[in-house]
Each structure stands twice: as structure tokens, then as C-alpha cells.
Amino acid sequence: SAQVMMSAIAVLVATVGVHTIGTLRREAFAAKQLGQYRLKQKLGSGGMGDVYLAEHQMMKRPCAVKIIRPDRARDPRMLARFEREVRATAKLSHWNSIDIYDYGRTADGTFYYVMEYLPGHNVGELVEEYGPIPAGRTVYLMDQVCSALQEAHGIGLVHRDIKPANIFCAYRGGVFDVAKLLDFGLAKPSFSSSNGDAQLTTEGSITGSPLFMSPEQATGEDQVDGRSDIYSLGAVIYFMLTGRPPFESENPIKVMIAHASQDVVPPRLVNPDISPEFEEIILRCLEKDAEHRFQDVASLQRALRELDVDDPWTSARAIEWWSCNGCPERKKMAAELVEAAAL
């Protein structure tokens, strides 16, 4: 009947319309290009901008492109932080710090920088998806983070935003469980700088992530040194082993007050499998008074290496774990994973 025919035509038009819209959206996204970099897939979003999987058009090298969001690009302080993140990270060459490839601005005023692409999980994702991380693997990963921080601290650079989301557990160069320290957007020289970088953060302002910030950051102290990063490392280790941060509240102010004034619940009360020796290391990192913490990252790293853990993590165990669990972004590295695990 005519009514049936009209219904069929309507369905056909709707189907074609949806297909056309979908095609146009895909083509619009595929057309996104920044200089020599073609954006392929959105990987995530942060406080300042969005991160995309991209490819260099000439070299065909996969990379990650971070683009500052338009609403943030109008804020001079955000632009300063974005630029500082690029410059601070570009000073670092350690294997466990993320590599920066490029930095630029498009004709329409979009700021971006290009970094190495990391297939894997950040520490927050690891804990969320698989639960607390065993002591052996925690030591294995944090030993690498300590190495990256030694280089940063050695040139007077304090990270100031160490947290699970900024520590990536990656597959790089045929190696599994490579720890990468990310996001130096809050980094600040611990000594006076002639180029003015030290003035990019307002004196007395609160910087960092409340769940993992040091007491001196929580109270807005101007003089923050590498021992502040050591506190944050201790807070991250606490989280890795217990599945929860040292202090929790829906109110960030309460969390900061707790960091500054309250005793932390000993991690062994949360996870009895933690050894007394490991707990001692964590609690020393989390001392309120910076003078009572490890005084440098090298000292913390030595303590971690001297720790006698029941389940030492090895490269072989890392391959086994990754072959069983893969990545949260399932499409990232399936072929590479199967090949490497079979070797």
C-alpha cells in the first residue's frame, strides 16, 4: 500500500541520513590536522586540554598530541602553564620521563605539543581495574620513577603534581612495565631562574592534586623543594598498595587540612600484607616535617632497592602479566602484545 511504501521510504531516508551524518563526522575528524600531524583518535582529557593519538604524515610515526582547549587558551596563566610543561619536560632526557617531539601553534591560534605515544595504563587505571598492586611490582615501578625524578631534581626542577594519573605503566622499546613520569605542568625551579620561569606560579597559591599533595603545598608555602615530591611519592605508594589515598573526603579542603595536620592511618591496617619495613618507608615519606623525610630521591630509591619483598617483580613477570591483561584501550597494541609475549 501507499502507506507501507511511504514508511519504507522514510526508513531508507533515515538510514541513509544517519550513515551520511556518521560519514561526515568521521571525515571531519579525519581532516583534523596540526601541521604535519594527523589526529586519529581521542585518548583522553585533562584540566588543560585534550590528548589525541596522532601520526606524523611524513615519518608515519605514532605520537600523542596535547591540545589546549579553546576556553583555556584565553587564560594567560593556562597558556603559561602549558608552555612551562613543554619546556620543563623538554629539558629531561631520562628513559622514564616522557619524550617531547614538537611544540607549536596553528594558524587559527591552537596551541599544541607532541609527545611519545604510550600504550598502557596509568597507575590509577591499574588500581581501579585490577585492585592494589603487589609490593614487588610497586617497587619495580617506583624505582623507575625515582630515577626520572633524580634527573629533574638534579637540574632544580620540582614536579609538584605527582599522582597516579601522572605515572604511566607503558610498553616501550619492546619492554613491558616501563614507568613514565608525565605532566610537568606545575613544575617549578627550586632555585632562582633568570628566565622568569619561577614566577609563573603565584606565590602562596595552592598547586597540585589534593589527594597526593604535600603539607607544604596544602598550606601554600612558597618554598617547595624536592622533598615535597618525596611526600607525594609516598602517598602514591600508599595508594598502590592499599587501593586508597592516605586521606579521603569529597571536600578537597578537608583533604588538604588532613595532609597538613592529621596522622595517616598506617598502611598495614588497610592491607596487612604490607611488610613492616615497607610501611616504615611509606610513613617516612609521609612525615609532615620535610626534615624528617628522605632528604633526596636517591635515598628513597636505595631504601626501595634494599627492601626484601616476597614477590619480586621481573621483566618475565611483566610480559606474563601484560599477555594476560593487555591495555584498557583494547585497540592499542594487541598485535604487538601477542608477538612480544610469544618471544
Regions found by a protein language model. Give the residues of each.
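AlphaC helix of the eukaryotic protein kinase fold
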Residues: R69-K91
